[in-house]
Amino acid sequence: MKTLTWTAKETMSILSAPAPVPEPGWIALRVAGVGICGSELSGYLGHNELRKPPLVMGHEFSGVVEEVGHGVTNVKIGDLVTANPLVTCGRCIHCLRGERQRCESRRIIGIDFPGAYAERVLVPSNQCYAVKDAIDGALVEPLACAVRAVGLARIKVGDTAVVIGAGIIGLMTVRLLGLSGAKRIAVVDPNDERLKISQLWGATEMAPNLGALLTDNHPQSFDCVIDAVGLSTTRRDSLNALIRGGRAVWIGLHEALTHLDGNQIVRDELEVRGSFCYTDDEFIRAVSLINSQKFLPVDRQWLDVRSLEEGPAAFKELVNGSPFSKIILTF
């Protein structure tokens, strides 16, 4: 089968590999659509310690069931599904609490298993969910990440919020903030095209940097800041923009080390929460939102769909500042 394989830093290659066969309880999907995630761009640049080349990445995907392993009864050949890419033990305290994203031995399809940048991918059958559209189905996973981040932010009606980063997770976060009752939703991104696109998702203010949103009279202006980038600078900015008692949720994964003012956190009673992946319930909510066919903006100028063969060029474009918030590869 054909694969898009990360072979070295800043190198994606179209290669061939044997088609995998599902074990008991697993299924093989003929990949229909797979999104390029910001964490994969970080890996591509050599900034993500979880990913090591050579690797077939791809954890945001949909596909058609092509083969089922022994004992699988919940899906059948021909079904169009998406899949939760988290593979966990099911026995540790976190799994037993319904918090599989914290599993002590968690693994992820596209990192620890070959991912969906290939014609075929293997997934656990009990983590598959029916979707109505192949392209939309590849957007469930990033939406589940946004669902968790906004849930951790504990938005109240009338809250003010800012989202740093107008990639797809940032944009989905904007939409969810609006649905949660936030009245002022600002978006920060250096890309002018992405800022314009954020209005389609419900942004009320846009700026190329956080300083442009803050005033001398109100240097700390927001109840909540969601950092969907993950740089040291954006993490520090997220704290500097909060009112006293404000909440910062970090969902972006990029730089490992960040120097913070601990006294500021104490004196202003700030909350800082990390947000990683999602619970099963949050993933299921994302499936429901996508299948409602009402969540995503009708105007899709934020999305571009390309062939797998265009994958190497797409990675280069995205790291150099693409106007598209999401590129999905198809077969």
Swiss-Prot record:
Temperature curve summary: Optimum temperature is 50 degrees Celsius.
InterPro entries, sorted: ADH-like_C, ADH-like_N, ADH_Zn_CS, GroES-like_sf, NAD(P)-bd_dom_sf, Zn_alcohol_dh
PROSITE patterns with a match to the protein in the record: ADH_ZINC
GO biological process: rhamnose catabolic process
Cofactor note: Binds 2 Zn(2+) ions per subunit.
Keyword NADP applies: no
Entry-linked Gene3D superfamilies: Medium-chain alcohol dehydrogenases, catalytic domain, NAD(P)-binding Rossmann-like Domain
Residues the record lists as binding NAD(+): 169, 189, 194, 251-253
Residues reported to bind Zn(2+) 1: 37, 59-60
Pfam families: ADH_N, ADH_zinc_N
pH dependence of this protein's activity: Optimum pH is 9.5.
Binding sites annotated in the UniProt record for Zn(2+) 2: 89, 92, 95, 103
E.C. code: 1.1.1.401
Keywords noted in UniProt: Carbohydrate metabolism, Metal-binding, NAD, Oxidoreductase, Zinc
Names of required cofactors: Zn(2+)
One GO MF term attached to the UniProt entry: zinc ion binding
Site (described: Important for catalytic activity for the proton relay mechanism but does not participate directly in the coordination of zinc atom): 141
Involved pathway(s): Carbohydrate degradation; L-rhamnose degradation
Reactions catalysed, as given in the entry: 2-dehydro-3-deoxy-L-rhamnonate + NAD(+) = 2,4-didehydro-3-deoxy-L-rhamnonate + NADH + H(+)
Family: Belongs to the zinc-containing alcohol dehydrogenase family.
Function: Catalyzes the NAD(+)-dependent dehydrogenation of 2-dehydro-3-deoxy-L-rhamnonate to 2,4-didehydro-3-deoxy-L-rhamnonate. Also has weak dehydrogenase activity on butane-2,3-diol. Does not show any detectable activity in the presence of NADP(+).
PANTHER family: L-THREONINE 3-DEHYDROGENASE (PTHR43401:SF2)
Entry protein name: 2-dehydro-3-deoxy-L-rhamnonate dehydrogenase (NAD(+))
